[in-house]
């Protein structure tokens, strides 16, 4: 060790443990445009002041550790440390606080969601001083956003590729999700696409199982796509799930999909991981493939109100990592999703600039500086009676995906697809004529039934089906 280093390390160093708030709680700090800002919902252990809890979060997710170390003297902690700069109590909750933390940009590797999450959502979530911790939102500064490619193509490029405008896109998840042979699976895909859907989909856990290996599925689905396109004159697609046990195998499947000439592949981005997802997104942009993203495992992370990571953060991370579609809940179907909160992160997926709006759970203004947008996918327990509400809630830039709501039609898959397409076209036409979908939705569907026996049959089957449970995801 050089004398100079010895002197710097020894001067002013005092071993021991000191409160985090002495270093990491800085209420006077003015945030910078280049800071990554985080809003944490913190539940301290009894006896732990909120200032100490917030400072502990800032410390443990940046430069801090449990004791003073002499190597602190070898760098500038003021430059690199996270700072808890504001704390506010959560209305209606005992001993819960929103703690705002600012992180200097130099803490993070460029273009790496993996590194960003490892820092901000790493060991701190197991910290003993906290009873619970939830990351509610992140502000990603433009300087960091510009280090990411983002979605392979984005909303406008996808519409141009498909030549479909002025309405939501329609999809269907093939059921049963497991157990079909590749040929029967391809048959179901063909029937749905021929009936009027834009897309069909592999379910999230369809990879390459003994009953249906991936290569066989890809071949039969490609045949179904081309046959349906020839008969309808419309561009069609099937989300071929490229998720695999290794990145190399995943890319191999995407390469085969490209060689078949199909328009879109799929990835389970949470179970597959952000590194794999970003790699696939880069491949898709370079090779003209759209990328559909499934969020399998998200509820393990985001459903508890006081611990975990809110889905709006996972949605922002996906936009940075890359994906052209992502499942976002339905508001009206069988899966969790409160309306205002869902629309908050739907806007974060689609729009270029989103203002802070605490009523929708948006803690920070977010500027995406032209990063392409992501289409939200409404999927899970929806059927034709939901079409007016879905069209009104999600608007044109969305994918409405009916699995059981297509394949459960009493006359078969193709009539189920016809029913959904007729219902959608009726709702879009009514909206364009100035009718109120929220108030007149059922009447609009009944009118369309008069000239579509397929829709009438679907309406009869699902007239009593509702999923009325209180949403867990509230402010």
Swiss-Prot record:
The active site is at residues 175, 294. One of its GO terms (biological process) is reductive pentose-phosphate cycle. One of its GO terms (molecular function) is monooxygenase activity. The modification N-acetylproline is found at residue 3. Mg(2+) binds at residues 201, 203-204. Signal peptide: none annotated. The keyword Chloroplast applies. Pfam families: RuBisCO_large, RuBisCO_large_N. It is an enzyme of class 4 (lyase). RuBisCO catalyzes two reactions: the carboxylation of D-ribulose 1,5-bisphosphate, the primary event in carbon dioxide fixation, as well as the oxidative fragmentation of the pentose substrate in the photorespiration process. Both reactions occur simultaneously and in competition at the same active site. PANTHER family: RIBULOSE BISPHOSPHATE CARBOXYLASE (PTHR42704), RIBULOSE BISPHOSPHATE CARBOXYLASE LARGE CHAIN (PTHR42704:SF15). Belongs to the RuBisCO large chain family. Type I subfamily. This is Ribulose bisphosphate carboxylase large chain. It comes from Clarkia xantiana. The gene is rbcL.
């Amino acid at each position: 060790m050089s004398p100079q280093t010895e002197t710097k390390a020894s001067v002013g160093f005092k071993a021991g443990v000191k409160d985090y708030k002495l270093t990491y709680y800085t209420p006077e700090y003015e945030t910078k445009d280049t800071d990554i800002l985080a809003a944490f919902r913190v539940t301290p252990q009894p006896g732990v002041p909120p200032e100490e809890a917030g400072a502990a979060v800032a410390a443990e997710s940046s430069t801090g550790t449990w004791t003073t170390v002499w190597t602190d003297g070898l760098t500038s902690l003021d430059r690199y440390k996270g700072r808890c700069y504001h704390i506010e109590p959560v209305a209606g909750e005992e001993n819960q606080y929103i703690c705002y933390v600012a992180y200097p940009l130099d803490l993070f590797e460029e273009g790496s969601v993996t590194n960003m999450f490892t820092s901000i959502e790493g060991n701190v979530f197991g910290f003993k001083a906290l009873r619970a911790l939830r990351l509610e939102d992140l502000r990603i500064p433009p300087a960091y956003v510009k280090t990411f490619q983002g979605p392979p193509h984005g909303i406008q490029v996808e519409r141009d590729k498909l030549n479909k405008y002025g309405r939501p896109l329609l999809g269907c998840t093939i059921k049963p999700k497991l157990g079909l042979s590749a040929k029967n699976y391809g048959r179901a895909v063909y029937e749905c696409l021929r009936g009027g859907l834009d897309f069909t989909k592999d379910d999230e856990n369809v990879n390459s199982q003994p009953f249906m290996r991936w290569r066989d599925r890809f071949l039969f689905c490609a045949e179904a796509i081309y046959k349906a396109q020839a008969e309808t004159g419309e561009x069609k697609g099937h989300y071929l799930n490229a998720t695999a046990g290794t990145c190399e195998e995943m890319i191999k499947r995407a390469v085969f999909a490209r060689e078949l000439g199909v328009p879109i592949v799929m990835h389970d981005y949470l179970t597959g991981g952000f590194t794999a997802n970003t790699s696939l997104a880069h491949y898709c942009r370079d090779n003209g493939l759209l990328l559909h993203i499934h969020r399998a495992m998200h509820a393990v992370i985001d459903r508890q109100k006081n611990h975990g990571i809110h889905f709006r953060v996972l949605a922002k991370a996906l936009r940075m990592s890359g994906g052209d579609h992502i499942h976002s809940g339905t508001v009206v179907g069988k899966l969790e999703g409160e309306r205002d909160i869902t629309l908050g992160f739907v806007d974060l997926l689609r729009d270029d600039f989103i203002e802070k709006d605490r009523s929708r759970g948006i803690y920070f203004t977010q500027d995406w500086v032209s990063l392409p947008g992501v289409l939200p996918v409404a999927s899970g327990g929806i059927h034709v009676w939901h079409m007016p509400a879905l069209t009104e809630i999600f608007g044109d830039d969305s994918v409405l995906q009916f699995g059981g709501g297509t394949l459960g039609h009493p006359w078969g898959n193709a009539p189920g697809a016809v029913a959904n397409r007729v219902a959608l076209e009726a709702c879009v036409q009514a909206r364009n004529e100035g009718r109120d979908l929220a108030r007149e939705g059922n009447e609009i569907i009944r009118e369309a039934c008069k000239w579509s026996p397929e829709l009438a049959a679907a309406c009869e089957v699902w007239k009593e089906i509702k999923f009325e449970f209180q949403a867990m995801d509230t402010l």
